A protein has these predicted regions:
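Conserved small/polar residues in nucleotide/adenosyl-binding loops
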Residues: 219-222
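Solvent-exposed alpha-helices and their adjacent loops that cap or buttress functional pockets
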Residues: 63-65, 83-86, 161-166, 185-187, ...
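Glycine/serine-rich phosphate-binding loop and adjoining beta1-alpha1 elements at the start
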Residues: 2, 8, 79-169
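N-terminal Rossmann-fold NAD(P) dinucleotide-binding loop
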Residues: 179-180
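An N-terminal-biased, well-structured beta-alpha scaffold segment characteristic
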Residues: 1-106, 110
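Glycine-rich Rossmann-fold phosphate-binding loop(s) that bind the pyrophosphate
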Residues: 174-176
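Generic secondary-structure signature for well-ordered alpha-helical cores
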Residues: 28-32, 55-56, 70-73, 109-113, ...
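NAD(P)-binding Rossmann-fold cofactor-contacting core
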Residues: 34-45, 189-216
Length: 222
């Protein structure tokens, strides 16, 4: 099977669907791997690093799409990218079909098989393919780091000769994968952390991480 990774066109997107290392694993399984020129540049992978791994680097998206059976991306494809694909080809990417119903209809009309990585269920059997949770974990961590950078003072409390500085108070709304990552990061930075979720049953998990669960006024703590 011929697998190709497109360069991401979204402004600021630095990720790439296939790295030289992952390409090596695919080739060991007997597949041919292609990447569009410059696809990995913003992720720190030069075209030469792909060539050294045995990957074929092609100059354009159109040529890559014509050359492969499976097209891999990180973000959802554009209408133009879908338009260049042929019946029988497979697309693997984040797709968000509920938000991109017209794009999904276009793919269906052209006879393209679309595998939406954002729809992979969070079960043990699919854990290695759960790219969405991995990205959510990073997003939760990064959100707190960015907030701390813009906060203007320490997250943790300080005791100095000049007096005390109280810890920052952080409220995390939502205790999904990203929220739990944000809670863990905030606690590790020394903040006083509060968290809310519409599911009161997650209170124990939140409190086990060192945060305080915020109940709605009508809820009773058992």
């Amino acid at each position: 099977m011929r697998i190709g990774a497109l360069r991401e066109g979204f402004e600021g997107e630095a990720r790439v669907a296939v790295t030289p290392s992952s390409a090596g694993h695919l080739m060991k399984l007997g597949h041919e791997v292609f990447v569009e020129a410059g696809a990995g540049a913003r992720a720190g992978f030069s075209d030469d690093s792909y060539r050294a791994a045995g990957v074929t680097v092609v100059p354009s998206a159109a040529e890559l799409i014509r050359s492969v059976d499976v097209v891999a991306k990180v973000r959802q494809p554009s209408e133009a990218e879908i338009g260049q694909m042929q019946p029988g080809q497979t697309l693997i990417s984040f797709f968000y079909p509920a938000q991109n119903s017209e794009l999904l209809a276009q793919a269906k009309e052209q006879g393209i098989t679309a595998i939406a990585m954002d729809m992979v269920p969070r079960i043990s059997r699919a854990q290695k393919m759960d790219a969405l949770s991995s990205m959510a974990n990073i997003a939760g961590y990064r959100a707190v780091i960015e907030a701390a950078n813009n906060f203007g003072r320490f997250f943790t409390g300080q005791v100095t000769a000049a007096g005390k500085v109280p810890p920052a108070k952080v409220l995390i709304v939502g205790a999904g994968v990203a929220g739990l990552a944000a809670i863990g990061t905030s606690v590790s930075l020394g903040a006083q952390v509060y968290a809310f979720d519409v599911r009161p049953e997650v209170a124990e998990q939140i409190e086990s991480m060192g945060a305080e669960f915020v109940y709605r006024s009508e809820e009773r703590r058992v």
